[in-house]
Amino acid sequence: MQHHPLPEYPRPALRRDSYENLNGLWQYAITGSAGLPAKWDGDILVPYSPETKASGVGRTLQPGAWLHYHRSFVPPAGTGGRVLLHFGAVDYACAVQVNGHLVGGHRGGYWPFALDITDALNPAGHDRLWVAVQDPTGTGVQARGKQTLRPSGMFYPAQSGIWQTVWLERVPENYITELTVTPDYDARTVTVKAHTSLPGGAANLWAVVRAGGVTIAEDWGSDVADRDGAVTLHIPEEHFFPWSPDSPFLYDLTVGTTQGEEEQRDTVHSYFALRKWSCAPDAHGIMRFCLNGKPILLNGLLDQGYWPEGLYTPPNDGAVVRELQTIKELGFNLLRKHAKIEPQRWYYHCDKLGLIVWQDMVNGGGPYKLWFVTYLTNVFQPLLRRLPDARPLWGLLGRETEAGREEYARELEATVKALQCHPCVGCWVPFNEGWGQFDAAGAVEAVRRLDDTRLVDEASGWYDQGGGDVDSLHNYFYPLRVRPRSRVVALSEYGGIAWPMPGHEPPRRAYGYGTAKSRAELTARWKKLQLETVLPQLKKGLSALVYTQVSDVEDEVNGLFTYDRTAIKPDPAAVRAVNQALEAAFEKIVE
């Protein structure tokens, strides 16, 4: 493992020229108190969690314990302005000191944050950074996904602390903190709103759109009541290139403030796409997902986003790109990002490659009564999948406390705001199989207030309240019978055929949904499932497929890839042929 991992710019949708990556070897200690440790336990390779092999530590942070980090650093070159310290994600709660001064903190293990550390910097240099972290894992109500201190089956080892890139940048006194970019496919426009750091600061904007390096639109903005600037740019018809899996065209966008001397202005670089999601009846009156006004078969995989050496954190950017490219080459156009939020670069690569993403809200809440939430409901799914998620069930579903419900509302908003800049995200999934679920109808309303340009899968699997755009089925055990409904039908989990491939690290206890004994048997069962069970349901309204899953994960050996991503388990040619057959059948059906 390299000593300076993941050096790439971590935020492609809001880029500046100033960039100083702080990944690498830091000192660490795990103690029982929040105070600075008297001594350090050794080195940790950031941004890998201490639980991972890649970190060089291999220790689990227990609830109540403190994980401390320390390193020295040099601020980005230049003078004046402000220096910002960025964290891609820290799980779960942290406090940050620079040169002994508390500069801020953060709560929430999946979302980026930045701290202005300018006033704490040492004029003579020799700056030092301390980070103290706590992670309650399963003892809290926070989003945690599939992390557990007792991993088995479909739940995986917990990870904690810094797990995404840490970096510095120098910005002007009044800088752009975020962009809200709203493309309008029908009007062929893009509206750009910049939020700036100082109340009453410069709000006038300049923006330019380029297509293939050619400037196609530019405009000025004006002050608005809240002192944030906005511009709307029109895309000429001859440069109208809709985004789709077959043609994932991205427009380049540059935005700058215009007031003050040149060194006082801020300039950022971004991108966007023109595309439109909707639901509409096909030629036979059956509801379908539509991209840019045309019915589309969403054919994809469940993606947990775990890696054997780094858990949540990939070994390098190239490994991420290779995996996504291979998925696309196999004929898939969809990934359901399951119970995890990825680093921004992952979505950037999906934007560029044309892979559609259905994004889960990361599940949290109190302990789940799995005997009820998962096992009983699954066995009796035909009877229970539409069970109301009303207050009497909140205790069983892990949302009995007001604090847990408030935490979910904050997490939902943070997720949408963090990812809505990515064209690849086509659907929000507020809840999965009842884990931490409550008031799904209210969650759909909250999502649509934040973003009304995407689909919403209200409740993936069961505890379906009848809202959102998707009738979302999970089916591993029953005969598949689909019928047309008022919402579009998606088979959002199925398959999961297990096969521990020889020559790869064996699981402690193999987990999956049926087991093959060889590559040939796995391939044959995959083909039979897709062509004899799934394909006939397309004409009855089935419009999205999410096979479980991309790769093996810990004890789960039901992936198409091995855990280390070095091999595809079924015959790749057969997978491509099956996906081509599904696509051809769908196109014929919706004609």
Task: Locate each region found by the language model.
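N-terminal carbohydrate-binding accessory modules
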Residues: 179-180, 254-327, 581, 586-588
